[in-house]
Amino acid sequence: MKHFVNPCIHFIQKQLQERGFKKVVLGLSGGIDSAVVATLATLALGSENVRALLMPSLSSNEEHFNDAFNLAHNLELESKIIQLAPFQENFAKQEGMDLSGKYMEKLDMNQKMRMGNFCARIRMTMLYDCASADNALVLGTSNKSEILLGYGTIFGDLAYAINPIGGLYKTQIFAFARALNVPQEIIAKKPSADLFANQSDETDLGYNYADIDTFLEAFEKLGGVEATQNKEREHIKEKLKNAGFECNMIESLSTRVWNNTFKRTKPTILEYKV
């Protein structure tokens, strides 16, 4: 994966030059994706031009926060800690949510998802405010697997100016992280969006990333991402079945990709002809 390093560095440098910026800002969660992007940005621009925001929520894993803090320190990044608790408490009060308990266990699953998405959008608000204050661009940290599956919050973590890793599947990110010497404790941990306590990507998605990415590669090669007609979609499902993928996986993951198309496209605008 070392051959990806220079193209990613060049991409960041070129995008900033073309847009007239010198600095970037990103959210640093302690996860592997943001660690890879922070490392790439530092290599591309120098640590003095990269700012990291650490934005833990009430249910954030302390280990994740510590990993983010240590990485920012090791990369010599200017960093800022923004606690999301006050925003969450106000939101919960308005919506009648009970936040008592260490891990918000009194919230039902729908409320947990709403709170998680709310936090993702508050984080992006903070990132864009910081970008405005610093005359910087917001860097995205979503990988290709997440983007295709819609596993992210629209106008939350899926909102950014540029993204150097959005063309890499999650399994490629792991290899990339090792090539960049990202700390092993970050590489080894279970992938988690940290939307609520004890949440993990692979539990949510129902499959491990190795299997997911194998499926997505085959799905994409068959034109599945662009398929819009039911007949075409059924034909793709049949081909995937013949390729050895089990029916439940085909149905689950293809439905995720198709149902979340709106997250990958610009808002639809009705155009009037004069």
From Swiss-Prot:
Binding positions for Mg(2+) per the UniProt entry: 33, 146
Binding site for ATP: 27-34, 141, 170, 192
Pfam families: NAD_synthase
An MF annotation (GO) of this entry: NAD+ synthase (glutamine-hydrolyzing) activity
Subunit structure: Homodimer.
Species: Helicobacter hepaticus (strain ATCC 51449 / 3B1)
UniProt pathway: Cofactor biosynthesis; NAD(+) biosynthesis; NAD(+) from deamido-NAD(+) (ammonia route): step 1/1
Enzymatic reactions: deamido-NAD(+) + NH4(+) + ATP = AMP + diphosphate + NAD(+) + H(+)
Binding positions (deamido-NAD(+)): 121
Protein name (database record): NH(3)-dependent NAD(+) synthetase
